[in-house]
Each structure stands twice: as C-alpha cells, then as structure tokens.
C-alpha cells in the first residue's frame, strides 16, 4: 500500500508535504506478533528512489493518542519542553523541541532543514577550551591531539634555542666584519621561525576544525 501521508522516523528527520523532497511510504505486513499485536514494515523512500528508513511498528501504535503534537525527532510531547514550528514543514513534521533541533543541527553540521530546506538563523559558539581538551572526540583524534601536543612541547624550545643561537652567531659575525655569514644566519633564523609558525597554525587549524564545530546553536 502506498500513501502520501507524512510520517515521522526515529533515526532520520521525517519528510513533509513539500515539493522539494517527496516521500513514498510502502507498508507491508510482516506476519509476526509482538505482545499479541500484528506488525507491519514501513519503508520510506525519497524522490530518487533511495531508501531512507525501514521502520517496524505494531498496529497498536496507530491510536488517537499519536495524533497529539509531538517532536518529530524524540517523539515526545510538550510536557517537558514547548514545541516549536521553526521551518515550513507542516503536520506532525512541523513541530520540534528547541533542544532537539539544536542537537540535530550540531550533529549534522548544517544550518537548514533537510526536508523543506528552510535556512535557520544559526549562531555558532565555540566550545570552552577546557571542555575541548577534556572531550576531544574519537580515539584516533585523541591520539592525533596527543601527538601534536608532544611535538609542540618538543619543537617550541628547540626552535627558540636554535633561533637564539643563530642570532647570537649573526651578531658575532657582524663584530668581525663577516657580513655574509651574518646575513646567512639571520635568513636561517627567519626561515626557521616561519616554518615553525606555519606548522603550528596548520596543526591548530587541523585539530580545532572537528572539535570547535561541535557548538551550541540558537
């Protein structure tokens, strides 16, 4: 059976009645019982035929209670938090909790509704540095961060001492009228600090991009 009625899904943002991304639901009887209730399988497909989700539900979930407004992400009502209609989606897909919306936008790293493509007014706020260091992310990112910190602690004093020795040698050569050697040492010092700053900025940008993107949005 195929129908055009909107549905809400537990794992992906459900579709709504908009021409941007129409959804087709195919309901099939799977012939099994759960707590004495028959089940059906609902497959939700996008316009291009891509399968978005397969949901197994019991017929008991189809009750007048489910007609109440609920959040399309967590499927909870407005008892704990008010429901908002921030985008152009309608029906059961048009209401959502603010906290659920912020968490969804943060996880997907987007600033628009993926159903109706309405663009939200998003303000990105970087996470506090202490929280960033405490929870840097997955295990491989933690290892990368630890390696970069060790390299930084090792290279920084090495670059500082090397630069100081080069400048000291350049001053000594100037006193002995060896300008060519002095210019060479000064150029070496400049190149050393340029490479050091370039490496530091590159590593900082690489580490901060995935972590600081996990921001609070409003």
UniProtKB/Swiss-Prot annotation:
It comes from the Eukaryota. Interacts with MARCHF2 and STX6. SMART domains: RINGv. One of its GO terms (cellular component) is early endosome membrane. Its EC number is 2.3.2.27. It catalyses: S-ubiquitinyl-[E2 ubiquitin-conjugating enzyme]-L-cysteine + [acceptor protein]-L-lysine = [E2 ubiquitin-conjugating enzyme]-L-cysteine + N(6)-ubiquitinyl-[acceptor protein]-L-lysine. The keyword Transmembrane applies. The gene is Marchf3. Zn(2+) 1 binds at residues 71, 74, 97, 100. Pfam families: RINGv. Pathway: Protein modification; protein ubiquitination. The chain crosses the membrane at residues 145-165, 180-200. SUPFAM superfamilies: RING/U-box. Keywords: Cytoplasmic vesicle, Endocytosis, Endosome, Membrane, Metal-binding, Transferase, Transmembrane, Transmembrane helix, Ubl conjugation pathway, Zinc, Zinc-finger. Signal peptide: none annotated. A zinc finger (RING-CH-type) spans 63-123. This is E3 ubiquitin-protein ligase MARCHF3. It is a multi-pass membrane protein. It is found in: Cytoplasmic vesicle membrane; Early endosome membrane. It is an enzyme of class 2 (transferase). The RING-CH-type zinc finger domain is required for E3 ligase activity. E3 ubiquitin-protein ligase which may be involved in endosomal trafficking. E3 ubiquitin ligases accept ubiquitin from an E2 ubiquitin-conjugating enzyme in the form of a thioester and then directly transfer the ubiquitin to targeted substrates.
């Amino acid at each position: 059976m195929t129908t055009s009625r909107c549905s809400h899904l537990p794992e992906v943002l459900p579709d709504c009645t908009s021409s941007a991304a129409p959804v087709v639901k195919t309901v099939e009887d799977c012939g099994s019982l759960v707590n004495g209730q028959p089940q059906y399988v609902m497959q939700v497909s996008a316009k291009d035929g891509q399968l978005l989700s397969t949901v197994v539900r019991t017929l008991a979930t189809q009750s007048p209670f489910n007609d109440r407004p609920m959040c399309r992400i967590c499927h909870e009502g407005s008892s704990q938090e008010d429901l908002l209609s921030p985008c152009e989606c309608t029906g059961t897909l048009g209401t959502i909790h603010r906290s659920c919306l912020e968490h969804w936008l943060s996880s997907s790293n987007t600033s628009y509704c993926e159903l109706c493509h309405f663009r939200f007014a998003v303000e990105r706020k970087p996470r506090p540095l202490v929280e960033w260091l405490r929870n840097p992310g997955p295990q491989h990112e933690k290892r990368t961060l630890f390696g970069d910190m060790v390299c930084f602690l090792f290279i920084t004093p090495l670059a500082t001492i090397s630069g100081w020795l080069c400048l000291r040698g350049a001053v000594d050569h100037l006193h002995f009228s060896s300008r060519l050697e002095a210019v060479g040492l000064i150029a070496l010092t400049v190149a050393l600090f340029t490479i050091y700053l370039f490496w530091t900025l590159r590593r900082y940008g690489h580490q901060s991009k995935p972590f600081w993107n996990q921001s609070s949005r409003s």
